[in-house]
Amino acid sequence: MTATVKDELSRLRVAKPCCRRAEMAALLRFGGGLHIVGGRIVVEAELDTGATARRLRREVAEVFGFPSTVAVLAAGGLRRSVRYIVRVERDGEQLARSTGLLDQRGRPVRGLPPQVVTGSACDAAAAWRGAFLAHGSLTEPGRSCSLEVTSPGPEAALALVGAARRLGVQAKSRDVRGVDRVVIRDGDAIGALLTKIGAHDSLMAWEERRMRREVRATANRLANFDDANLRRSARAAVAAGARVQAAMRILGDDAPEHLLAAGRLRLEHAQASLEELGALADPPLTKDAVAGRIRRLLALADKRANALGIPNTEASVSPDLLENA
């Protein structure tokens, strides 16, 4: 999934100058750094895809007006894959100052530039886009799904955690064998971040794989069911879970809290009956009350989807989904 996300982000067109600057600042910060060559400051970034290297060169030229060079390092030895080295030599110091890699006194900035750290939500999203393009990875959805960015240091990692917080996404900074990483493990949080940074097609593919894994897990449990009624109930639970998950994605936080709470209960206890869900609610509810709230949540989401011209919750229940159940 990492290559898929990076390919999509590399093709994303961004119009706002502040966002383009924030993305480039993060891409250079997480992808490389500053070097002194012959008494001059050289800005360098080492990247793992040619598309990202081309994007960096184009943006440096269009936004900042500086030329750059690219060198290709073939795979071999300790390098498992081709690497692309983008360098700005003649105008390195000017680029470093323009992107905030150097402060006003000419000292290296260890985290992210102040204009990115204190910027708007779009700047935070752009910084995450640049950081992911530089050193991000996304694992296949499953029990241990994660989105990670390798950081050049703890200051940059904490700045990225703060940027995620401004986007409403919880990320954590961790030191793994001496390497600073920013990690997001919650599936819904990963989906929210992919949306924020503009990886919409990748999100759909990731969510589809995530749903298939959940369906397979349910199918494995169904293999031990002898009672046909239990099978029908399980299929209904899969369908209900898929529709509620779609409703939560469509509505976000824009729905009455008691309806969202019922939806969360359904997702957190996928195999529970309505009566069991009612007992788990706080305060407890009857099964009819739980069913009514979930129905209203789905209706609200379908109405919103129709208004926006996007697939409604019914579209999430495909024949393949039920057949695999």
Swiss-Prot record:
Source domain of life: Bacteria
Entries under InterPro entries matching the protein: Homing_endonucl, Sporu_reg_WhiA_N_dom, Sporulation_regulator_WhiA, Sporulation_regulator_WhiA_C, WhiA_LAGLIDADG_dom
Biological process annotations from GO: cell division; regulation of sporulation
Known DNA-binding region: 273-306
Any one GO molecular function term: DNA binding
Keyword Transmembrane helix recorded: no
Keyword Ubl conjugation assigned: no
NCBIfam families: DNA_bind_WhiA
Function: Involved in cell division and chromosome segregation.
Protein name: Probable cell division protein WhiA
Name of the encoding gene: whiA
